[in-house]
Amino acid sequence: MSANFKMNHKRDQQKSTNVVYQAHHVSRNKRGQVVGTRGGFRGCTVWLTGLSGAGKTTISFALEEYLVSHAIPCYSLDGDNVRHGLNKNLGFSAGDREENIRRIAEVARLFADAGLVCITSFISPFAKDRENARKIHESAGLPFFEIFVDAPLNICESRDVKGLYKRARAGEIKGFTGIDSDYEKPETPECVLKTNLSSVSDCVQQVVELLQEQNIVPHTTIKGIHELFVPENKVDQIRAEAETLPSLPITKLDLQWVQILSEGWATPLKGFMREKEYLQTLHFDTLLDGVVPRDGVINMSIPIVLPVSADDKARLEGCSKFALMYEGRRVALLQDPEFYEHRKEERCSRVWGTATAKHPHIKMVMESGDWLVGGDLQVLERIRWDDGLDQYRLTPLELKQKCKDMNADAVFAFQLRNPVHNGHALLMQDTRRRLLERGYKHPVLLLHPLGGWTKDDDVPLEWRMKQHAAVLEERVLDPKSTIVAIFPSPMLYAGPTEVQWHCRCRMIAGANFYIVGRDPAGMPHPETKKDLYEPTHGGKVLSMAPGLTSVEIIPFRVAAYNKIKKAMDFYDPARHEEFDFISGTRMRKLAREGEDPPDGFMAPKAWKVLTDYYRSLEKTN
């Protein structure tokens, strides 16, 4: 035992004679109600133990990332990190090692008592020290889970990027666990992770399932994305049944919502909203039905509903299920239908903040059926549009897999419904740079243009996709670290209300960073021509929105054309005279007239796509 430790320990003993433990005034239950966005006390310690190189730190940080992404407050205490601060006065003698683990156990207990899931990753080689850590928690009435991260010594040595095992075998490091100091394997751990046989994600899932069994992690966290497709082995049977059922004709807009629901973008919805879900969305911007308070808040800011006429309601009201038919083809079954009044003005006023029928989406609502029908969906097959772009329509599960295949450790999403200019690219490049500076190794950009219904004067999807391809071809964005995919949602032009929907869908698809621009999902008021929504409110609302805590919001820095640099640049008010703000209206006017924008505004090939589009309009007209 070191002399410093003995001196400090003796001094601590002398001070402790007149110290009285003070009880908290706030109970754990009350603390649990306000810690994180998922109410309920879930304080505990997950104690990872194993040889150096077994994978403790990797699993610890991956588990922390998983829990935080599901809005469960947690913190990871790493052995090396703690020895840089709290325990920097301790060495590696037997006494110092014992004190190292004791201190960590006490700190972990405080974290757990505060309502966090505390994850510790320490070799902690001796059984008596780990047992003492358990007793510290159990005496305080706090759960303690010992997780043995088990990997053979030769595997640990092969992973030794620091060269510690090599130095220990050379005699340069004395008392190194596994070489000349014993590691006492846990006899009855709560979980054993075989890291030489299982992937990191599999190991994390094992721990999550343990926490689920102990009611630390809610069941809803594990269920993941809800796709609504009929299982392959039952498609023929359900399709045959669909042919015998009454049918409801649906519009292209309705089919786009069927696609959204079936692919899991609206998880946990099981179909078009029934009245209870509709009212929750309309009045609270959240889904509460069937979710107990400890399972937290599910953000849902827009109603996903199926309008029907009074005649169709009268015809189908007594059915337990019926088929949805698009252009003569039965695409899905709707089960246990519930019909309720479509109060259009109220819906529009709450979603859009206005009910003017001159708004393009509100116009469609006002012209739709006077009734809504909700019910569970069984979708017979994946929705395909056969427009040459289906390969870009990746589902949330496919996007998650693609990010995994690219070894992404951060995914930042950019939602757009317009062509990409170099100002957009500057923001995406800057976001990537900042993520690399923060220590991420493989940040991936999800360039995710909206592919559902848009208003008539927006550039059509096929031309936008050509333009995005040209941007990548000219390497304005890095093709190797970019996923271009189509987000199948229709556009509502509902400003801050809609931008929450856009963000939560990307969150479901695995994004953990979301770039929000000026006036997202906004448009000019159809009557006054002023901004329908205050341009900065979208970003502000996203930063406060309930249920979106697993996504970090990246505000859109204002970019404009720098006349001196002849390039897009972040706007500096102190140099206002250097900048030219090229509006979308001006950009479209230049493209329509076949003129070139200033050098550096947009990649030349991408600009040519835009001018080709407007020329095609002239020919059509």
UniProtKB/Swiss-Prot annotation:
Tissue: Expressed in liver, cartilage, skin and brain.
Pfam families: APS_kinase, ATP-sulfurylase, PUA_2
Reported impact of residue 79 to R: In bm; activity abolished
Catalytic reactions on record: sulfate + ATP + H(+) = adenosine 5'-phosphosulfate + diphosphate; adenosine 5'-phosphosulfate + ATP = 3'-phosphoadenylyl sulfate + ADP + H(+)
Classification via InterPro entries: APS_kinase, ATP-Sase_PUA-like_dom, P-loop_NTPase, PUA-like_sf, Rossmann-like_a/b/a_fold, Sulfurylase_cat_dom, Sulphate_adenylyltransferase
Region described as Sulfate adenylyltransferase: 225-621
Biological processes per GO annotation: 3'-phosphoadenosine 5'-phosphosulfate biosynthetic process; blood coagulation; bone development; sulfate assimilation
Region of interest: Adenylyl-sulfate kinase: 1-216
Record-listed ATP 1 binding positions: 53-58, 198
A GO cellular component entry from the record: cytosol
MF annotations from Gene Ontology: adenylylsulfate kinase activity; ATP binding; nucleotidyltransferase activity; sulfate adenylyltransferase (ATP) activity
Sequence positions that bind adenosine 5'-phosphosulfate: 80-83, 92, 97-100, 123-124, 162, 175-176
Residues where ATP 2 binds: 415-418, 517-521, 559
Keyword Disulfide bond annotated: no
Pathway linked to the protein: Sulfur metabolism; sulfate assimilation
Keywords: ATP-binding, Disease variant, Kinase, Multifunctional enzyme, Nucleotide-binding, Nucleotidyltransferase, Transferase
Entry EC number(s): 2.7.7.4, 2.7.1.25
Alphabetical list of CDD domains matching this protein: APSK, ATPS
Family membership: In the N-terminal section; belongs to the APS kinase family. In the C-terminal section; belongs to the sulfate adenylyltransferase family.
Described function: Bifunctional enzyme with both ATP sulfurylase and APS kinase activity, which mediates two steps in the sulfate activation pathway. The first step is the transfer of a sulfate group to ATP to yield adenosine 5'-phosphosulfate (APS), and the second step is the transfer of a phosphate group from ATP to APS yielding 3'-phosphoadenylylsulfate/PAPS, the activated sulfate donor used by sulfotransferases. In mammals, PAPS is the sole source of sulfate while APS appears to only be an intermediate in the sulfate-activation pathway. May have an important role in skeletogenesis during postnatal growth.
Disease: Defects in Papss2 are the cause of brachymorphism (bm), a autosomal recessive disease, which is characterized by abnormal hepatic detoxification, bleeding times and postnatal growth, such as dome-shaped skull, short thick tail, and shortened but not widened limbs. The abnormal postnatal growth has been attributed to undersulfation of cartilage proteoglycans.
Protein name: Bifunctional 3'-phosphoadenosine 5'-phosphosulfate synthase 2
